[in-house]
Curated annotation (Swiss-Prot):
Any one cellular-component term (Gene Ontology): cytosol
Organism the protein comes from: Listeria innocua serovar 6a (strain ATCC BAA-680 / CLIP 11262)
Gene3D superfamilies: 1.20.5.1300, Nitrogenase molybdenum iron protein domain
Co-factor(s): Zn(2+)
Free-text function comment from the UniProt entry: Catalyzes the sequential NAD-dependent oxidations of L-histidinol to L-histidinaldehyde and then to L-histidine.
Gene Ontology biological process: L-histidine biosynthetic process
Active site as annotated: E322 (proton acceptor), H323 (proton acceptor)
HAMAP family named among the record's database cross-references: HisD (MF_01024)
EC number assigned by the record: 1.1.1.23
Record's protein name: Histidinol dehydrogenase
Ligand binding (Zn(2+)): Q254, H257, D356, H415
Length: 427
């Protein structure tokens, strides 16, 4: 890991220079062609792309409910029990996010209000590749269920051995309505446009590789999306009370995701910086995903030594990390200084994987600095708000002159006339 010192601006400039997009014109061009093909040829394009990219010849896209139940019965009962405990925690947290409708009748003859409606159909993308992510199933599906979404469709790319049974078990437990064995940009296109087999959805959520992210960007507007996810990130803030072994383990927990993952320690202590680097190299040797984590920490890992706690928080807020750990003495005292972070972990025993799997808050988080203006996935992301208005003639009469004046100042005479006509004698 590279150590950074110096002025705050110099440190931030180096971090900004590295934080470039993972997409490219070439990838965007390929994705557009894939989307157009799926739009024009539907299921056949999905069969062709699955054979090409996944090496699997499919006879059907939808996974039968009987296969899902067989997979659920096959997994280790202890895994299923852990999944149920995680589900309970996630539901408990997200139930508290539910928004309320309201009715306002403070003025005579005026009724105003807000109604909350769930989206009708949501598509959930679950990655395949080098790791299985049953936790992503729970985190994407359960908030949608709590919001009241009636139809939840999941897609995930197949392998030669089919779909990972742990992913299918998680989908079964979470209450997914339909599962299709298709992934990549072609899977996103199918959800956005619909095919003979796969229904068009209102919103697409879930992480994926750069092709999936680019496809989500392309179809946004036709459907809603959650966010464009970049590589995993973690920033750990530490003082001399922190434990280097804990810091190193938590940095590696993100570095093992992806060679592009960013693992950053910001500390006021040179001693902690040095001990963490030693501990990280020691722990790295025993990781099954050592090659991935090693490349991530060598290419994108940073240890930043600051002169003060205030500088530490300033740099962190500029990074706006996906995951933030505060391993400082009395960490709750610093909560108000955190402006930009996806998910916050306070204290030596609030390790980041606690949020990935079990505590309850969502692990679908803004990355690449977007925590400055985006929030974690939640129940509200699967709902929409509508306002309603009702006026009596008497109530409108009290306000008509002000409305007509505002409309006339904007040069919108038909707006003004729509109010005035209601008070002409024949009406």
């Amino acid at each position: 890991m590279k150590t950074l010192t110096g002025t705050t601006e110099a440190i931030l400039n180096e971090l900004r220079a590295e934080n470039s997009s993972n997409s490219s014109d070439q990838i965007a061009s390929e994705v557009k062609a894939i989307i157009e093909n799926v739009k024009n040829t539907g299921d056949q394009a999905l069969f062709d792309y699955t054979a090409k990219f996944d090496g699997v010849e499919l006879n059907e896209l939808r996974i039968p409910n009987s296969d899902i139940q067989i997979a659920t019965n096959k997994v280790d009962p202890a895994f299923l029990e852990a999944l149920k405990e995680a589900k309970a925690n996630i539901e408990s947290f997200h139930n508290k996010q539910k928004q309320s409708a309201f009715l306002d009748s403070e003025k005579d003859g005026v009724i105003r209000g807000q109604i909350i409606r769930p989206l009708e159909t949501v598509g959930v993308y679950v990655p395949g590749g080098t790791a299985a992510y049953p936790s992503s199933v729970l985190m994407n599906v359960l908030p949608a269920k709590i919001a009241g979404v009636k139809r939840i469709v999941m897609i995930t790319p197949p392998s030669e051995n089919g779909i990972n049974p742990h992913v299918l078990a998680a989908a079964n437990l979470a209450g997914v309505d339909e599962i299709y064995q298709v992934g990549g940009a072609h899977g996103i296109a199918a959800l956005a446009y619909g095919t003979a087999s796969i229904p068009k959805v209102d919103k697409i959520v879930g992480p994926g590789n750069v092709y999936v992210a680019t496809a989500k960007r392309e179809v946004f507007g036709l459907v809603d999306i959650d966010m464009i996810a970049g590589p995993s990130e973690i920033v750990v803030l530490a003082d001399e009370t922190a434990k280097p072994a804990f810091i190193a383990a938590d940095l590696l927990s993100q570095a093992e995701h992806d060679t592009l993952a960013r693992a950053i320690l910001i500390t006021t202590s040179e001693k902690i910086a040095q001990q963490t680097k030693i501990e990280l190299n020691k722990q790295l040797e025993n990781l099954p995903r050592k090659a991935i984590a090693k490349e991530a920490t060598e290419s994108h890992g940073k240890i930043i030594i600051t002169k003060s706690t205030a500088e530490m928080f300033h740099i962190m807020n500029e990074i706006a990390p996906e995951h933030l750990e505060v391993q400082l003495e009395n960490p709750m005292n610093y909560l108000y200084q955190i402006k930009n972070a996806g998910s916050i972990f306070l204290g030596n025993y609030a390790s980041e994987p606690l949020g990935d799997y079990f505590a309850g808050p969502n692990h679908v988080l803004p990355t690449s600095g977007t925590a400055k203006f985006f929030s974690p996935l939640g129940v509200e992301d699967f709902t929409k708000r509508s306002a309603f208005i009702s006026y009596t003639k008497e109530a409108l009469a009290k306000e008509k002159d002000a409305i007509v004046l505002l409309a006339s100042k904007e040069g919108l005479d038909a707006h003004a006339k729509a109010i005035q006509i209601r008070f002409e004698e024949e009406n």
